[in-house]
């Protein structure tokens, strides 16, 4: 089983071909093909190649499925005896992609 570890938006993801992953918003149209080149490690046929920091010549080809927004996350802070409270909401924008090919 071959897999790859790549970096996108300050996070690292471990994927195999055919996986569906939620990445940070990329502003691409659905069915667009995108290449991700910040590949940290690739394992093919049991051989692991790690980069310093990235693997030379490695890339991951992905197909954009859609874009959307996640459910709202509420943060609530209350300071006791101070009659003070704060309520905030945050919705993450994401791009759903399918891993089509891992090139190493």
Swiss-Prot record:
UniProt cross-references to InterPro entries, sorted A to Z: bL21-like, bL21-like_sf, Ribosomal_bL21, Ribosomal_bL21_CS
Pfam families reported for this sequence = Ribosomal_L21p
* The keyword RNA-binding is annotated on this UniProt entry: yes
Give a yes or no for keyword Metal-binding in this entry: no
Q: Which GO terms describe its cellular component?
A: cytoplasm; ribonucleoprotein complex; ribosome
Which key words tag this protein in UniProt?
Ribonucleoprotein, Ribosomal protein, RNA-binding, rRNA-binding
Q: Which GO terms describe its molecular function?
A: rRNA binding; structural constituent of ribosome
A GO biological-process term:
translation
Report the PROSITE patterns cross-referenced here.
RIBOSOMAL_L21 (PS01169)
Q: Which family does it belong to?
A: Belongs to the bacterial ribosomal protein bL21 family.
Q: Which HAMAP family match?
A: Ribosomal_bL21
Q: What is the role of the protein in this entry?
A: This protein binds to 23S rRNA in the presence of protein L20.
Its quaternary structure?
Answer: Part of the 50S ribosomal subunit. Contacts protein L20.
**Protein name per UniProt:** Large ribosomal subunit protein bL21
The gene it comes from is rplU
């Amino acid at each position: 089983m071959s897999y790859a570890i790549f970096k996108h938006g300050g996070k690292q993801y471990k994927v195999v071909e055919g996986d569906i992953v939620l990445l940070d918003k990329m502003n691409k149209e659905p069915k667009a093909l995108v290449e991700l080149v910040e590949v940290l490690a690739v394992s093919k046929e049991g051989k692991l190649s790690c980069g310093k920091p990235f693997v030379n010549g490695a890339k991951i080809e992905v197909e954009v499925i859609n874009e959307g927004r996640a459910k709202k996350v509420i943060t609530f802070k209350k300071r006791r005896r101070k009659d003070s409270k704060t309520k905030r909401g945050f919705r993450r924008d994401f791009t759903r992609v399918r891993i089509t090919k891992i090139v190493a």
